Amino acid sequence: MKKYINDRLYDTDTAFEIDTYENRYYDFDCRYIKETLYQKQNGEFFLFGQGGSWTKYRQPRKRGGFCGSAVIVPLSIDNAKEWVKEHLSPEVYILTFGFIV
């Protein structure tokens, strides 16, 4: 997926894929969430997030209700660190950011 946000290009095909988090629901469930953390060549981080109609990724439908969607969310380095701490293993954190001091 490619998307321009604030005059910056975010591209999942050219960025480095760090790791992926999925919640416990099946991918056809309206509560399903899948988020992948990427790092661009310039060091910026972003999430490619997708989810069902009962998640933070939902989008309104034209005729009412909601549907699932996929979006790109730019992250500061501090937000990326917090996301990794919350969703991934300590090993991924160390490989990505180094040891916690």
Residue ranges and their predicted role:
Residues 1-101:
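Secondary-structure transition motif
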